Amino acid sequence: LKNVKFISSNPELYPPLTQLLTAENFTRPKDVAKSILSLLKQDIQIKDLLLKKNSAVSLNEATSISRKLDKFPLLHNLMRVCPLPDLEFEKFFITMRRLFLRNLNKVEVSPELIYFLSTLSIQCFINEYVYIESDEETHLISELEAEISQNLVQLMQPEAINILCLASYRPLHQYDWCQKLESLDNLGEVKKRLIEEPLLEKMIAKDIPMLEEISDDVSLKVRGQYEENPY
């Protein structure tokens, strides 16, 4: 499957490929990601969504798209285990992410939308927030950070959708208040992947013994990268 490129649609392959991704130690997701994406891009619904990526300018359309993507657990599972090596999908999700950030106060929350934003936040964490970000988005994220922080100071829990939107732009574990987010208690995988595991890795990194003091610039940079991502 590693070097296979699909040229026609075959939805019957979705369940076994989903199982392939979720079975532990069976294959490395990044080795089959391009093949799986080539299959998904032959699906008429996915084709239609990708063609509309630059015209998805309304909140209603973005919400509708999140519902349609709910029918593709194969895509969701792939996004939760490895970066998507595909520029079309990247542009598509950049557009979706921006739309929901701009319209957070107007969004009609649904299980499908929460599932989509959960998947998107995990994907952005995995790809180390490589998606391009406009100045407008940076400003809106700063406002969202302040709003969530203020909510917690006032002993109010932020809406899950607000946290997920922030998590698609910034690593949640970097915030001092991340362990106070009870809104994520019903989103176990998000909480584990974006908060609990990174914090555990930080603790492990601190406990790694250092034989001698590091002084040269290159070694300091390497140590800094390792402490950020021990694995």
Predicted regions: what they are:
Residues 231:
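Hydrophobic pocket-lining residues within nucleotide cofactor-binding pockets
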Residues 1-224, 228:
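N-terminal accessory segments
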